[in-house]
Amino acid sequence: MRITAAVTVAVGTLLSSFVVPTGVAEAAGAFPPSEKIFPASTRGWVSISHGPEFRQRFNRTQYGLLLKDPSMKPFIESVRKQIENSNGGRLGRLGLTLDDLLEVAGGEYALGAIESPTGKLATVVLVDTTGREAEARSLIEKMNQRMVEQKGTKVAVNGGDSLTVYQLPPGENTGRTTEQRVAFALSGNALVVGDDSALLTQVIGTLGQGRGDCVGSLPAFGEVMGRCQNQVPTSAAAVRWYVDPLPFAKAYQATNPPREKRKGPDYVAILGRQGFDAVKGAGGVVVFDDGGHALRHHTMVYAPPLEGRQPDSVERFNLAARMLQFPNAEDIGPQQWVPRDVSGWTSLQFDLRNAFVTVESLVDDIVGEKGVYDDVIASVKEDPDGPQIDLEKDLVACLGSRATLITDHTTPIGDDSERLLIALEAVDPERVAATVAKSMSIDPDMAKIDVQGNVAWELIDRSMAIPQLEVELPGGAVPHADHDEDTHRRRTKLREREEKLLPHSVVTVAQGHLFIASHRDILERVLATKGDVEALGSAMDYTQVATELNRLLPGKAATRSFTREDEAIRPAYEMLRQGSMPKSKSLTGQVLNGILGDGKPGTVRTQRLDGSTLPDFEMVRRYFGTAGVGMQSLPDGWYITGVTLPRSQQEPEVARRPVTPPQ
C-alpha cells in the first residue's frame, strides 16, 4: 500500500525520464556546482554529481537490472512512446529520455524548478558535457528536429553561445490552450535547457563564477546539506535534492491550474495559515550500489522552533503545526503480534493527546466554519441519541504515543485485495475497550463478533467507516462552508466520504492496543500470531535490515519501518497489468483516483498507463529486495535515513500463509 524505493526508482524513472537530473562531481567541471548557479528563488533542485559514474552504479543495482530485463522491454518501449505521443507540457515536448540526457553528461546533471516573477515555476536542466561534446551537438540537432515536428516557430537565435527559442502551439493531449516556449543552448561545455528564455539567459551568464544569491546560500539548504552530505563519499555520484515545500506547492498550483474550477478548500493556503510554513526546507542525498546496499538515502526536514520558543516544547510552532511532535523512544521494533510474513510494517511515535487538541484550528479551516471541530466532539458527548462519550477523557487520554501500521494483501489480486491494520497503544486498555463497546453497541451498522477470543465490532453496512469514534477530519475534495449553506448536508457528505476508506472495517481492543483493521482476515492473522518464530522480529530479512538501520541511525528513534518490496508492489503491479488500477478499493487506489480523476463523485478515471505489456510478476520478483527507514526527531527538525538491500543478501523467501479473501 505504500510506494517503496522500488516504485520510486524503477517506475518513476520510466515516467519522469525527461526530467531526472544528475549533478556535479567536483570543481573541475564546466561550471561551478549547480547550487551556486541556480538562484535563491529555486523551489526544488536535484543534482547528480557525476553522470557516467551514476549511470554505472544504477545499472548494477536491482533497479537497473530490472529495466534491462528483456521481459520488460515491451512495457518500457510502450511507456516511452506514450510519453513522446502525449505532447506533455513543459520540457516533455522536447521528447528527451533519461538515456538522452545521461548520454551527453560528462559531469554534473542538475534540474531546478525556479519560481519566476510571475509566481509560476520555470524549469531549467543543466548538464556538464565535458568529454561528450559531439553527443551534445547531436542532441541539440535532435531537439531542433523535434521542435519542427511539433510545429514550433523559432523566435530568437543569437550568435556566439546561441540561445535557441521556440514558440510551440498548444499540444493536442496537454489540455492547455495557450502557446508555450522552449529554449536551449550549448554554452561551452554546458548544455542548458528550459522553458523560460529570460531565466536561461541569467543561468548562462552565471556559468563562469556562479552567483551570490544562489539556492546554496539559503540557510535551510545549508542546514540540510550539512546534515546529510557528509554521510556519503564524494566518489559515490550521489543524487542530492532540496525542496522548499510550501513555496514549491504554491508555485506549482499557479503553474498547473485545474482545467475545471473545483469546489473545496485550498490546502496549500490552509497549511500556510496553520503554521506549517515552519518547515523551511527538506532535502538530502541518495546513493546507489553502495557497499551492499542497492540504495541508501539520508534526508533532513529542517524546521527550527520559532524565535523565542523551546525546541522540546509543544509550542515550538503555531496553531495546528504544533501537532508535529514525534518523541524518540528506546525500542520501537515490531511487536510480538506482527505476523512474520506481512508485506510491510511501520511504527511511529506520535503525541496523540497533543494532536487531538491542536488539530482543532486545522479542521475548522478545512471545513470553512469556526467551531465545527468542537461541535463534533460535543455532539459525541452530549447527543442523547449518541454514545455520550467524552472522547478526550474516555479515549484519547487512554491511548499511548505509539502507532503501528501493518500492510499486506490477499491472493488472487483483485480490486479489494490490499489489507491494512492500524494499532494504537493503549495505556488503559480496559477503559478503551469500554469506550469502544459503548459506542459500537448502539450503532445498528456494527455487528458484535468474536475474533480469536476477543470481542470485536465489524461494519456490516457502508454508512460510515468507524462510527462515532471517527472524529471528522475531512480530506480530499471536501465541501466547503462557502459553497454549502446546509450544515447537516455538508457533514453528511463528509461522513459519506469517510465511509469509502474502510468499508469492511473491524475494531477491537486486545494485546494492549486498539486495533482498527480494513478487513476481518488481517485482524485474525494478527491476533493469532503468538510471537517467537511466528513474529516479524524473528525473520532474517527483517533482522538484516534492522541491523543496517541501527548502524546508520543508532540510538533512540521516532519511526522505524520495514518493507518487502516484492509483496508491497505486487498488488499495484497486478492491477496495472490488468488495467484495473482505477477500480482499486485500497487507500492507494483511492488516493490516485482523487489525484488523477476528474473530481466528479461516482466517476471512475481511465487508467493513463497501459500495463498490458508488463511480464508476469514472477518473472521480475527477483529484482525486488527489502527496505527499511528510520527517523529521529532533532531540535531543529527530523533526520531520516533508509536502505534497500538486494535479494542476494537475504534469506530464502519467507513463506506466506495461504490467505484468500473471504467469500
Positions of the model-derived regions?
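Positively charged n-region of N-terminal signal peptides that target proteins for export
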Residues: 1-4
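Bacterial N-terminal signal peptides
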Residues: 6-21
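Extended terminal
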Residues: 25, 494, 517-518, 545-663
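Structural boundary/hinge residues at secondary-structure and domain interfaces
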Residues: 25-178, 222-280, 300-416, 433-446, ...
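Hydrophobic, ordered structural segments
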Residues: 53-54, 180, 185-190, 194-214, ...
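Intrinsic, low-complexity N-terminal interaction/targeting segments
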Residues: 93-97, 101-108, 164, 251-254, ...
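A conserved glycine-rich beta-strand in the N-terminal activation segment of trypsin-fold
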Residues: 176-255, 495-588, 595-598
